[in-house]
């Protein structure tokens, strides 16, 4: 009698012991949880923190995480991008175990932290994959959640859209993978207290063959760069990208670069050249501590009636221990 009740409970929660596709203790093979181009329209802001103490360490022995972070954050460039409806996808087949919707999208501040206490995940979905495996999807856009409790989903099923509900400082999806109730790092398939990997490509982790080629580990990344007529601001950039394209009579022309996961000691260098003798440079002092997000810019104010027509070119570099670890170039052309 007790055995029958346990079986019924497992079936009710979606862990069907008679369904071999779900009832397996083998590691999951996860697809990308966001319908985006990884490294171009979305980026990994934070990995799982595998350090058991107050220090931080990601799976690749880097610092692209924060203390006690139990998931992976896939970020968009701005809330404006999230407003277009970037889909959140089931990473593997399973049964929806829980959902929440209706929490507003708003960036976290001192006031909102208390409003989301015990609901920091915001709008989200939990999927039971059987064999003790489950995935949780957080910070989804208010009103976007399509999944329902008990629903069977396939890998790639649309669950809703990326947002910034709950405790979120930027538009992103937080994905947590668990096995038997314990958080698992999807980049290694191991629990959070495992050793880091000096070669992040040595272990495919839980990702399937569609994700592995797209992922390139980076502890320091330039996620956006270009020309603008306004001095960039990090908070505004999270709202709408912070870009106001320059014109022939803009009061200033500025080249900027937005970066994530910089390390203490990094130096950010910008160089801009253009027609009419246009030239501007900037070099930061070595950063005193790690920076989850950072913005740098260089430019000039207009001192004549209009900017000279032609192509303006800017280059941004992150220099670490004397070597360039990432570099991007962008241009802006002003027609005659």
Describe each region flagged by the PLM:
Residues 87-98, 146-161:
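Short, well-structured beta-strand-loop connectors
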Residues 323-336:
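Short beta-strand elements
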Residues 280-290:
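Solvent-exposed serine/threonine-rich low-complexity stretches and specific carbohydrate-binding patches
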Residues 26-55, 115-117, 146-151, 176-256, ...:
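Acidic, glycine-rich catalytic/binding loops that coordinate metals and/or anionic ligands
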Residues 310-319:
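A short tyrosine-centered beta-strand micro-motif
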């Amino acid at each position: 009698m007790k055995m029958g009740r346990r079986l019924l409970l497992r079936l009710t929660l979606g862990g069907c012991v008679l369904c071999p596709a779900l009832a397996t203790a083998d590691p999951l093979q996860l697809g990308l949880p966001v319908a985006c181009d990884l490294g171009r329209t979305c980026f990994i802001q934070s990995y799982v923190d595998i350090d058991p103490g107050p220090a931080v360490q990601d799976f690749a022995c880097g610092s692209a995480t924060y203390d006690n972070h139990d998931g992976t954050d896939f970020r968009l460039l701005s809330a404006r991008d999230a407003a277009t409806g970037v889909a959140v996808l089931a990473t593997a087949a399973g049964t929806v175990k829980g959902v929440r919707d209706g929490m507003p999208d708003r960036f976290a501040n001192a006031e909102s932290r208390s409003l989301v206490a015990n609901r920091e995940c915001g709008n989200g979905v939990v999927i039971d994959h059987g064999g003790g495996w489950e995935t949780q999807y957080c910070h989804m856009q208010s009103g976007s959640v399509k999944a329902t409790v008990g629903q069977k989903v396939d890998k790639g099923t649309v669950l809703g859209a990326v947002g910034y509900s709950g405790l979120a400082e930027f538009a992103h999806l937080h994905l947590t993978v668990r096995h038997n109730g314990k958080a698992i790092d999807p980049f290694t398939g191991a629990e959070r207290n495992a050793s880091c990997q000096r070669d992040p490509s040595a272990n495919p982790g839980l990702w399937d063959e569609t994700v592995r080629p797209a992922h390139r580990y980076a502890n320091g990344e330039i996620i956006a760069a270009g020309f603008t007529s306004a001095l960039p601001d990090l908070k505004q950039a999270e709202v709408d990208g912070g870009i106001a394209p320059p014109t022939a009579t803009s009061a200033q022309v500025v080249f900027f670069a937005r970066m994530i996961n910089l390390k203490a000691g990094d130096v950010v260098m910008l160089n801009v050249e253009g027609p009419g003798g246009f030239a501007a440079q900037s070099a930061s002092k070595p950063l005193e501590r790690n920076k989850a997000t950072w913005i740098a810019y260089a430019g000039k104010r207009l001192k004549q009636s209009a900017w000279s027509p032609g192509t303006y070119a800017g280059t941004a570099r992150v220099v670490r221990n004397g070597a360039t670890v990432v570099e991007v170039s962008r241009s802006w052309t002003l027609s005659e």
